[in-house]
């Protein structure tokens, strides 16, 4: 859902451009959504509930509309529910409940939502869209997006910084795909030729995800070798010190 703007407890290492965008976007959405978040708190709604409902909405938008070729309305529904990721983070901050659990839940459900979106594309191309190549590309986007996220999480779990974000992160994958899907859906309103945007976007996401995966694997390999060399040097130094 909304990684680039706000989430509960997740850290990021954006580029300067992304950091500037995040700064102004965060300030804007905080002003807009704070009253609504406060209203939900007064009604006894928890941040976790908002997270779960938001994910359910994204899944419904993707798997109900996209397989039928209703890309415009599906994207509208998904976009509306994506804002839940900003609301739950705002609520958590107001309640002083930012936690590891919230960060874990957000990240986990983000992966589920991503899978539903690209799964919806795959179902369309496997059915009414009748294009096996684009079905395969959609499945690749789904799988590669999950693996790209896993490489960073796994690298960090073994103590490596994984000091690279890569060419196409989750935010870029979603923006490219959803914007293209929304515009492609205008074909049903009589806009000719615009449906070609979605296949182009899927190819861009697929290639970008592959490049990002390679970037992260290479980075983890280099950092791992450096860490192993540093450990070996430290052990050798301690061994020589003990011998003397």
UniProtKB/Swiss-Prot annotation:
Its main location: membrane. It holds the Pfam family CDP-OH_P_transf. The chain crosses the membrane at residues 24-42, 49-66, 72-91, 117-137, 174-190, 196-214. Keywords: Cell membrane, Lipid biosynthesis, Lipid metabolism, Magnesium, Membrane, Metal-binding, Phospholipid biosynthesis, Phospholipid metabolism, Transferase, Transmembrane, Transmembrane helix. It is found in: Cell membrane. InterPro entries: CDP-OH_P_trans, CDP-OH_PTrfase_TM_dom, CDP_ALCOHOL_P_TRANSF_CS, PIP_synthase_PgsA1. Mg(2+) 1 binds at residues 85, 88, 106. Contains a di-nuclear catalytic Mg(2+) center. Catalyzes the conjugation of the 1'-hydroxyl group of D-myo-inositol-3-phosphate (also named L-myo-inositol-1-phosphate) with a lipid tail of cytidine diphosphate diacylglycerol (CDP-DAG), forming phosphatidylinositol phosphate (PIP) and CMP. PIP is a precursor of phosphatidylinositol (PI) which is an essential lipid required for cell wall formation. This is Phosphatidylinositol phosphate synthase.
